[in-house]
Amino acid sequence: KKCMKTLLWLDDYRNPMEDDWLNFSPIGKDVEVVWVKSFNEFVDYLNKPIPLPDAICFDHDLGEEKTGMDAAKYLVNLCNNLRLKLPKFNSQSSNPVGRENIMSYLENYKKISSTKSYY
């Protein structure tokens, strides 16, 4: 039995198991979903002594000061410092500017980091 891939779902509101939200998953719908609802929960999950998730879906507006963009920056710093490959990613945010910022930030890091030998 193959291991299920893990999708980390960052969203304060949308339940990833409802409606068609898993259409946003960059690794398909046959996934184990971990739903975190805040920046702090996101950070706590990434700091566990387990491998990074296979993919992460970002919401932008989390109903608090910290946004999905802060989470994206945290992820990039973590991957950069620990020389880890960036998980696949997408954003289900209904904030078009926030969504674009997160996606282009992560795409840019992916481009830069792919030139490094450990990627």
Where in the sequence are the language-model features?
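Catalytic phosphate/metal-binding cores of nucleic-acid and nucleotide-processing enzymes, i.e., regions
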Residues: 3-119
